[in-house]
Amino acid sequence: MTMKNKNHTAEDIEQGLTSHDPAIRRRWAEYPYFSPTHVQIERGLTDVSWGVRIAWVRGMRFTPSTEQVDRGVRDTHEYVRLAWAERKDFTPTPEQVEVGLTDPDLEVRITWAKRINFTPTPEQVERGLTDTNAKVRKAWAQRMDFKPTPEQVERGLTDADLSVQAAWIHRTDFQSTPLQIERGLTDEHWNIRIAWAQRKDFTPTPEQVERGLTDLREFVRAAWACRLDFVSNAEQVERGLTDEQWWVRKVWGSRCDFIASPAQVERGLTDDKDSIRIVWAERMDFTPTPEQVERGLTDADPWVRKAWAQRTDYTPTIHQAERGLSEEDPNIVLVWLNRSDIVWTHTHIQKGLQHPVMEIRKAWEEVLQKLHNSNDTPADACSLPCV
């Protein structure tokens, strides 16, 4: 007998669900091609085999009653209680919540702490935040349905477990004190320093900014470079643009609180990393030279070429435009077609209307329609097809 058969009769199913072998009963409980009766559900949820009970709980083929949930959250086997804690199709009663949050099994307590369809009492919050297990404390620190007291915040920010500390640092419902900020920004653990650098509830002092931008950890330096609540000085800009780590250079290249020098522009446009060349191609605080334009339009990376095709502070040559039309990436071709500083010839239009990509053909039809509407003609046109 195969469980892939969709045509089992009600008698087959009932026989399987009442088999003397618990393995068979479990397999039939997992059989997806039938709607169980109330009698079958109740019998499955009270089966002597915990494996069968789990199969029924996880089957999600019924809406449990309050009595069934009550019985499930108090089941003698922790795996069954865990399966009930993971179900999302019931709103637990206060009594059921309390039973789950005080379960002797760690995974069950964690799962209940992560449920979001109940509002915990202050006592439950305090008990969860002081649980002996760090995973439970972290789960409670990540809940957003309670307002922590200053004492709870301080205790969380100094928790012995770094993941619990990070969870508290990422909360946005408390105002950090200057002492907490300074302590966090100088923490010996770099991931804690990053988390504090990402908080937005304080304006850093110049000393804190400088210390963050020169941190030994590149991830911390990048996190500080992402902040927009300080104005960088020339030394910080130059140091950031020449950082040994490319993602730090990328963040600095995307900042808009400085005007890049010609040397910085040239260095950014020729960086070894494609993503950095893209960032610099998108900057609008410089006018590119013809050499920079040509180099960008012939870059080996298509995203760099697209970024240069989107710039409007230069007039492309007809050779550059024709090269853009021959790009393999249709998105780059469409960028060129949307430019307003190119006069397309009759040859371009005729060739474009035969393009194998439908989106490009439609774009050429729009170009042609605009010419008709404006009574203009292509540079070498003698007759135009009707669209």
Language model regions located:
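Alpha-helical scaffold segments
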Residues: T2-V387
